[in-house]
Amino acid sequence: NNSLNFLGKVNKGLFIDGSEDKVIKLKSIITLLYPFKNINVVKKFIDKDNLNSIINDRFHNDDEIDFFSIDVDGNDYYLFENLKVRPKVICIEYNFWYGPDVKCSVPYDKNFTWEIGSTYSGASLNSLCELAKRKGYYLIALESHCVNAFFIRSDLKNNFEIIDNIKYFRTPKYY
């Protein structure tokens, strides 16, 4: 999970996961490695209708979120579309199986569950980049496993190289 990489760099954070096992493990990691940080871990299934209220319950309106990761193996596009806060950086999982040119996402289904091994999930990188531009974000990086895209808020874009999603699109080397 990309978010774990940022635990050492932030003092305040929120992790939301629907898996009891993952929540227990994450709480143990935070307690062991980062006991003095204000990191909340919430066990809850998120959807496009409850995402903002979960965030608002834990952050004040004037709190600026530095990093926000969306990785739900399905409804990522719709969560991003409905996200009201404006973090500096957003990391979103995309489905490389759709290729570089296609703009698509699985239809919204509050109860969507990704089946391990299935290529049917999430959204194409192209569709997420289009949505990001509408929301005032720009693509700055694709991680090496070809499943996470990093977007920077428009007021910070001059500090980064904006990349072209089609030019930089890759598929993982293990496929």
Identify what each model region corresponds to.
Residues 2-5, 9, 54-56, 101-175:
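Rossmann-like AdoMet/SAM-dependent catalytic core
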Residues 1-70, 96-99:
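SAM cofactor-binding core of SAM-dependent methyltransferases
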Residues 74-85:
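A short, conserved alpha-helix within the catalytic core of class I
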Residues 74-76, 96-99, 147:
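Short, catalytically relevant binding-site loops at active-site mouths
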Residues 68-73, 90:
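Short acidic catalytic loops
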Residues 21-30, 85-86, 98-100, 104-110, ...:
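Class I S-adenosyl-L-methionine-dependent methyltransferase catalytic core
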Residues 87-95:
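Conserved beta-strand signature within the Rossmann-like core of class I S-adenosyl-L-methionine
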